[in-house]
């Protein structure tokens, strides 16, 4: 049961990140780099002990080969 919860949360995170990363900019709108909150995948999801899996999934969506959470709660992607 616990494993299914972890898998469901990981799939939800991957789906949200995939939708977010594929969003097309509006025509005529200048793209501005927004402030990105760091460590959300590692800090928030560490409560359910899925931080490393969510970080790895996030990095896969970005096109990297995986990732891990640091002691400071930051997600580091491997290229």
Curated annotation (Swiss-Prot):
Main localization of the protein described in the UniProt heading: secreted
Subcellular location: Secreted
Protein keywords: Antibiotic, Antimicrobial, Defensin, Disulfide bond, Immunity, Innate immunity, Secreted, Signal
Signal peptide segment: 1-23
Top-level lineage group: Eukaryota
Gene Ontology CC terms: extracellular space
Lipid metabolism listed as a keyword: no
Pfam families reported in the protein's UniProt record: Defensin_2
Disulfide partners: 42-69, 55-75, 59-77
GO BP, sorted A to Z: defense response to Gram-positive bacterium; humoral immune response; innate immune response
Protein family per UniProt: Belongs to the invertebrate defensin family. Type 1 subfamily.
Name of the featured protein: Defensin-1
Organism: Stomoxys calcitrans (Stable fly)
Gene for this chain: SMD1
């Amino acid at each position: 049961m616990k494993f299914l919860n972890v898998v469901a949360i990981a799939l939800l995170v991957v789906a949200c990140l995939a939708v977010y990363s594929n969003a097309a900019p509006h025509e005529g709108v200048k793209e501005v780099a927004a402030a990105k909150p760091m460590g959300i995948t590692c800090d928030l999801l560490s409560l359910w002990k899925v931080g490393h899996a969510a970080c790895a999934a996030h990095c896969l969506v970005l096109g990297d080969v995986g990732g891990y959470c640091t002691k400071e709660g930051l997600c580091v992607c491997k290229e």
